[in-house]
Amino acid sequence: MKRILLLLMSVFIAAAVFSQDRVRAYLVSNAHFDSQWNWDVQRSIREYIPKTLDQNLFLLGTYPDYVFNFEGGIKYQWMKEYYPHQYELIKRYIREGRWHVTGSTWDATDPNIPSAESFTRNILYGQHFYRREFGVEGTDIFLPDCFGFGWTLPTIAAHSGLIGFSTQKLMWRHRPFHGTSKIPFEIGLWQGVDGSRIMAVMDAHNYTTKWRYEDLSHSKYLQDIAQSNPLNAVYHYYGTGDTGGAPTIESVRALELGLQGDGPVEIISATSDRLYKDYLPYSSHPELPVWNGELLMDVHATGCYTSQAAMKLYNRRNEQLADAAERSAVAADWLGAVPYPREVLTEAWKRFIWHQFHDDLTGTSLPRAYEFSWNDELISLKQFGDVLTTSVGAVSRGLDTDVKGLPVVLYNAAGFEVSDVVEVTLPLEGSKFTVYDDKGVRVPSQVLGTQQGQTRLLVEATVPAAGYAVYDIRKGGQPKAPAIKAGAWGLENSVYKLTLDANGDISSIVDKRHGRELVAAGKSIRLAFFPQNESYSWPAWEILKKTVDASPQAITGEVKVTVAEEGPLRASVCVERTLGDSRFRQWITLREGAQADRIDLVNDIDWQSSNALLKAEFPLSVSNLSLIHISEPT
């Protein structure tokens, strides 16, 4: 009897010790799906959406332990619109917890170019769609293939109620960034700029991993990775990319075999958030390391933030116009002028923010893809513009515009009072005008020109935060003499004296208030030309360090400087140059009044150079750290 008891006790003790020695492997299936890249959205909908649906529905129906993770609200929307039968089938698997809605966003956004408002709305619209369609919400940021991750990501994610983040892209780095490692750790906590924290998997391993048919519970590979970190756990993608689809049948069979295995690795067929939930609350796990900083790339990020500049322009204009439209619409609704256009604004936001996808806004898709991207961007601009015009017009009709001359209503969408020089187009011709504010005080103005019964007029105006101001414009009066000096030598107003060199570059800016030179000694503010960027594998992604370390060429061909505009409120010079077959026109502008301390440089470039770079250089003698500063590795 004693022998039996001793034997049982030894078995129990051995089992307990074995259990503690086991490591965990969270195997996270995925079908990485670039909405656009080397194909356009039409092909994604026609080929890659049905492939993803059919292959995963087969696996889900055949292998009871298979769990599939898939992200991107816009892709689910395409499923609903174009493949309604399969869409209804995946709803059942979502209810069963086997098809997992991951990522939380409307699409897998680039986290660096979009504004914080856009990033937040990407999550907002994704979550709203998931709640409405499936009765669930995502809990994580799932970005296997993005080109670096800004420090704001964990803050935005945490304030959106999300708990985790994963990627595998950081291992693409060329150089180590953290001692001898490319990442600060494999699994831990990432702290945002405000102290918020989410769990972060910084190396989830290759998302196209395919398992061989073997008992994964005995995998030395998984065991070694898990034992290399203090959690004794590994989070590992497996599946396919970049055109959707599903993991291989052999991979899923290996997963099922491993789930039944008795080896030192506990296999978990995991949703993308299972690891994060297992470690909540994070404050109870002091073994989790913490990273407090950015996660940047030295490859696949150094060029894509300048590629396809039109996309960046349209995106930023949409972000700005969306904010203005939203503010004006809320005020108009509150004042009873016009109902709040919720559906129009939501549609416009969703139409352009899916193009913030990491191969779209970044400029790394093929040219045909941008025909669809630009189209959507322009439609959203039109929708936001219509909302802004309608809302401002409705409120303006209720304002007191009983003035002696022509009333002009100005609207300020910013959340603070703005004093600026405003350009107004009047429906009448004239060479002399006087302008008065709502208190009857004359304000500075400047006629720019007349054409076809209209006059372009500059007015120095002040408009309250998110508010309106009425100005009275009358014909006649004595125009003021120009207060800004302009010539081929440069420009001068009450704040700055700006001098051009023989190339038309800005060689000096003297701040007259403080008697200080703002341009670094021996330098000039200029356009600089780099003739070769020898990135042949990833030309849209990369600007090589050796390219920008080289000395650039000055642009000095056929330099011509003319005075483009001169008046009491604004003056500008136009600098024309050539380099090879490329032609450059640059307008340098100074103002007077509230914006006298502002210098504008606007470039119009006919670019005829290939495999080359153009850089705007601003070598200043002063710096502004603003709120925080970030130390970068050299």
Model-predicted segments: where are they?
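CE4/NodB-like, metal-dependent polysaccharide N-deacetylase domain
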Residues: 119-151, 156-159, 220-237
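Surface-exposed loop and adjacent secondary-structure segments within mature catalytic domains
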Residues: 89-97, 117, 150-209
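Residue-level detector of conserved catalytic or cofactor/ligand-binding positions
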Residues: 626-634
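N-terminal catalytic cores of secreted or lumenal carbohydrate-active enzymes
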Residues: 20-122, 129-132, 159-162, 189
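Catalytic and substrate-binding regions of extracellular carbohydrate-active enzymes
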Residues: 342-346, 354-605, 610, 616-617
